[in-house]
């Protein structure tokens, strides 16, 4: 089942944490979920240029704190913090509450699954060949320290009449290993032929208890060509 489910949801409480952190009552749960959805949609739309990887929402008593993890935090903050204040005012108008916003930087943007998926989607919208876009992202992730990466695209690839799915994989991506730290990202490319879905899985190593990184010593192997699927027409 590791290949079917969302790898982040499967590892919650093991080596991944929730992106919405609050304890609601039965009365407040629906409104909180709807509010979180509005906040995420608003920030994704307003900060599309900054490479937003993750949005974490925390609630404590009557306080609401939003943490935005982005590849280019300087663009969000702006000169003397002018731009971040505009975003904060927009959020206050949207949800009618006081909000505090924290900005964090992605340490290795090229090894971030969400940013990689959005990168492939952007290239597809610019009519770059899908195989070239996939391989370019995979090479960048491996150079940034990823242990393995899998990229999957689905839709009317290259304008084909019949939709199909193709994927490439390099390195190891152990989806069934719960201690494996798997990053997952999804994006959609709006092309003239229709929507193309992009999924990216990035393996960043194994994590044991107390956050210890564990790497197996493997014998040197000859470099092999990246594997690709046999589904659909090649």
From Swiss-Prot:
It comes from the Bacteria. One of its GO terms (molecular function) is structural constituent of ribosome. One of its GO terms (biological process) is translation. Residues 39-107 form the KH type-2 domain. Signal peptide: none annotated. It holds the Pfam family KH_2. Keywords: Ribonucleoprotein, Ribosomal protein, RNA-binding, rRNA-binding. One of its GO terms (cellular component) is cytosolic small ribosomal subunit. Belongs to the universal ribosomal protein uS3 family. Part of the 30S ribosomal subunit. Forms a tight complex with proteins S10 and S14. Binds the lower part of the 30S subunit head. Binds mRNA in the 70S ribosome, positioning it for translation. This is Small ribosomal subunit protein uS3.
């Amino acid at each position: 089942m590791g290949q079917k489910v969302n790898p982040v949801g499967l590892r919650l409480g093991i080596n991944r944490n929730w992106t919405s952190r609050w304890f609601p009552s039965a009365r407040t749960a629906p409104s909180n979920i709807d509010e979180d959805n509005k906040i995420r949609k608003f920030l994704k739309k307003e900060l599309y240029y900054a490479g937003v990887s993750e949005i974490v929402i925390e609630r404590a008593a009557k306080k609401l704190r939003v943490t935005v993890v982005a590849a280019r935090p300087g663009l969000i903050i702006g000169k003397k913090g002018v731009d971040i204040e505009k975003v904060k005012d927009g959020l206050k108008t949207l949800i009618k509450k006081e909000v505090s916003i924290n900005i964090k930087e992605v340490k290795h943007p090229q090894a971030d699954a969400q940013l990689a998926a959005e990168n492939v989607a952007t290239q597809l919208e610019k009519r770059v060949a899908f195989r070239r876009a996939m391989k370019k992202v995979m090479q960048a992730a491996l150079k940034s320290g990823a242990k393995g990466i899998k990229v999957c695209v689905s839709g009317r690839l290259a304008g084909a009449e019949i939709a199909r799915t193709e994927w490439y994989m390099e390195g190891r991506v152990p989806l069934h290993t719960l201690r494996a730290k798997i990053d997952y990202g999804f994006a959609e490319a709006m092309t003239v032929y229709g929507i193309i879905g992009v999924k990216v899985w990035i393996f960043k190593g194994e994590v044991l208890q107390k956050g210890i990184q564990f790497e197996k010593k493997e014998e040197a192997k000859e470099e092999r060509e990246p594997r690709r699927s046999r589904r659909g027409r090649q």
